[in-house]
Amino acid sequence: MSKYSTIAPTERLPEWLRRPIGDASALERVQGLVKQNRLHTICEEGRCPNRGECYAAGTATFLLGGSICTRSCAFCQVEKGQAPMAVDPAEAQRVADAVEAMQLRYVVLTAVARDDLADHGAALFTTTMEAIRARNPLIAIEVLTPDFWGGCPDPQQAVAAQRERLSTVLAADPVCFNHNLETVQRLQGEVRRGATYERSLGLLAACRELAPTIPTKSGLMLGLGESRDEVIAAMRDLRAVDCQRLTLGQYLRPSLAHIPVDRYWTPEEFDELGAVARDLGFAQVRSGPLVRSSYHAAD
């Protein structure tokens, strides 16, 4: 049993967070293709409220590396465990099949953390990008990666290994590199087990250094107990490593086993924070209660 299981919700879901699922036919079609190809999407695994809208617009986010994550973040719906599936050598081709069948124009690739693999899953991204482009080289591909950290007891070796894994992904030339900070600095230990604030900022900084033509992107969830000042401080830290794109969205508790919502930020508060982010110099900002990492990613 999770330590959060006995903490009941204290507020009802506000009206602004209730929305229809969207285009039911598009949703059913994509769900059928995903099931047929034995794939995973973060849209479904994470129960994203925007998935119907995104499917209808010709975008989807595929989850690579199976459905079991080696990290145990307190907010995430994805199944967790230390014995994930063996890497499926046919996964990349099945993703490419689905992208072709869905006639997608913009694809986001993400992955569960695979701390059990020597490259921490870097090749999952590159082989899938290669398979998609073999069918249609004009498809734009964004990557949303884990931090590629671990496997080296020496800190300097760990940084070098992280940069090597990152370089592998960047060499495949995604149109955008996304790595989420997820929450403010104070809440990292509770929310992102196995990851750190500084490590994520370092990854984004390394991306700008290694591939300055590839834009970087990051996201924050609100509603975990952070203050407005802490959110702005995190945005400043992201700009300090030249992160160019930002998403801000409301955290929604997937189940009673997950960390509770502290409060629901209003649409007006999201608008105000979005304005602050633009003033700080972010080139692209998506800020709203239902915004997620890949929301309107193709815009």
Swiss-Prot record:
PROSITE patterns membership: RADICAL_SAM (PS51918)
Subcellular location: Cytoplasm
Cytoplasm keyword on record: yes
Reaction(s) catalysed by this chain's protein: [[Fe-S] cluster scaffold protein carrying a second [4Fe-4S](2+) cluster] + N(6)-octanoyl-L-lysyl-[protein] + 2 oxidized [2Fe-2S]-[ferredoxin] + 2 S-adenosyl-L-methionine + 4 H(+) = [[Fe-S] cluster scaffold protein] + N(6)-[(R)-dihydrolipoyl]-L-lysyl-[protein] + 4 Fe(3+) + 2 hydrogen sulfide + 2 5'-deoxyadenosine + 2 L-methionine + 2 reduced [2Fe-2S]-[ferredoxin]
Any one GO CC term of the record: cytoplasm
Residues reported to bind [4Fe-4S] cluster 1: C43, C48, C54, S294
Chain coiled-coil ranges: none
Binding of [4Fe-4S] cluster 2, residues: C69, C73, C76
Molecular function as annotated in GO: 4 iron, 4 sulfur cluster binding; lipoate synthase activity; metal ion binding
Keyword Isomerase on entry: no
Note accompanying the cofactor annotation: Binds 2 [4Fe-4S] clusters per subunit. One cluster is coordinated with 3 cysteines and an exchangeable S-adenosyl-L-methionine.
Top-level lineage group: Bacteria
Cofactor(s), by name: [4Fe-4S] cluster
All copies of domain Radical SAM core, residue ranges: 55-283
Record EC number: 2.8.1.8
Pathway participation: Protein modification; protein lipoylation via endogenous pathway; protein N(6)-(lipoyl)lysine from octanoyl-[acyl-carrier-protein]: step 2/2
SUPFAM superfamilies according to UniProt: Radical SAM enzymes
Keywords, in A-Z order: 4Fe-4S, Cytoplasm, Iron, Iron-sulfur, Metal-binding, S-adenosyl-L-methionine, Transferase
Family in the record: Belongs to the radical SAM superfamily. Lipoyl synthase family.
Protein name in the entry: Lipoyl synthase 2
Organism in which the protein naturally occurs: Parasynechococcus marenigrum (strain WH8102)
Gene for this chain: lipA2
